[in-house]
C-alpha cells in the first residue's frame, strides 16, 4: 500500500509525520484526528507498524473521531464492502481506547464540526471548518474531485450512489447559500473552489 497509495510506511508513523514536523510539531502534539470514513486510503495514516512490528496509533495522544455507524459497518458487510477496510487501520485505535464516536452532526471543537454525507459509505461524514464568518467544507469522498460537482457525476466506488446524489444536493444548496469553500481531497489539479451563485446548476468557480 505504501508503493501504490502512499498511505503507509514501515517503522515510522507514516508520511504524515514529515509534514507535521515540517510545520514545527510532532505526532504527540496532535490532539484530534478526524476520519471522514475508514477506507484504507483515508484511515491508512491512523496507525503505523513500529520497529518491533507492532501496529500502533500514529497519534497516541489524540482522540480519533468517526461516526459510530462507520466503525460498526467497517467490521461487517459482504466482500465488496470488506475490500476497502483494513482492520489494522482502526482496531488498534479501539484497543488503545482512543476512539471518540459521534452519531450524526457533531461539534468536534471550536470552529470544526462534522456533518453526515452518506452514499460513498452509509456513514460517511464531511468536515466543516468555520472561521471569521466563513466556512470551508472538506468533502472527502462525497465529492472527491472537481469533476464530481455536477449532481449526476458519482463515483463507481460509492456503495449507495443515489444516496450520494441526495447528500450532494443538500450540501450544494447550503454551500451556494453560504458561499462555502469546497475542498477536494482526491483532485490532483483543483484543490478548492466555490459554487457559482448565478448558475441554475452546480457550477464550480475555481480559486
What is the role of each PLM region?
Residues 7-18, 128-207:
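Cap/insert and terminal regions of metallo-dependent hydrolase folds
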